[in-house]
């Protein structure tokens, strides 16, 4: 294949790259997580049309390597995991993009996935913030060999561990 773009905003190794789900809010975006503790958000249409290869946002808050990023629900919320033992949920609909929930574990979190029943992305709009509906579930895979399932309790609160 022919290279059509080269994104150079991360100075350290990139560990995860993912696209938003198709046919949802922000489906024209991709997310890049790096050892520089940053997640960059890119507009795929701007890259494809050679308008801009610059990230539209840089999400900061993790204190270690970003190991995984996954879009869930209606595409407005993404989950990120890190070597700092924290999974974070981010609301792409806020400006600037806000971390709306954190969940800490005892070991680095290598991966995250949304439960298929949670992929509908039910939410309630309140001003500029999004409330994740209680009951949305995601799973994490950690350095201790455990897979944990969480159910969100809503924006700004910790998730309940259900497994």
Locate predicted features.
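Loop/turn segments within WD40 beta-propeller blades
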Residues: 18-28, 63, 70-76, 113-120, ...
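Blade-level signature of beta-propeller repeat domains, shared across WD40, Kelch, NHL, RCC1
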Residues: 115, 134-162
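WD40-repeat beta-propellers
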Residues: 17, 39-44, 87-92, 147-152
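Conserved strand-to-loop turn within each blade of WD40 beta-propeller repeats
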Residues: 32-36, 80-84, 141-144
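WD40/WD-repeat beta-propeller blade N-cap
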Residues: 8-14, 59-66, 102-109, 163
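A structural motif specific to WD40 beta-propellers
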Residues: 2-5, 50, 54-57, 97-100, ...
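A conserved positional marker within WD40/Gbeta-like beta-propeller blades
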Residues: 3, 11, 38-40, 63, ...
């Amino acid at each position: 294949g022919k290279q059509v773009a080269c994104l150079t905003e991360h100075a350290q190794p990139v560990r995860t790259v993912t696209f938003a789900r198709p046919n949802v809010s922000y489906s024209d975006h991709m997310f890049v997580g790096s050892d520089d503790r940053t997640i960059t958000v890119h507009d795929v249409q701007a890259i494809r049309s050679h308008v801009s290869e610059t990230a539209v946002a840089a999400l900061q808050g993790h204190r270690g390597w970003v190991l995984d990023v996954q879009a869930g629900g209606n595409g407005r919320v993404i989950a990120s995991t890190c070597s700092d033992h924290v999974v974070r949920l981010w609301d792409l609909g806020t400006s600037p993009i806000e971390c709306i929930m954190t969940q800490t574990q005892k070991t680095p979190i290598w991966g995250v996935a949304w439960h298929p029943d949670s992929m509908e992305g039910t939410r309630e709009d309140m001003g500029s913030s999004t409330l994740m509906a209680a009951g949305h579930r995601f799973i994490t895979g950690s350095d201790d060999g455990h897979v944990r399932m969480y159910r969100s309790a809503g924006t700004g609160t910790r998730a309940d561990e259900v497994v």
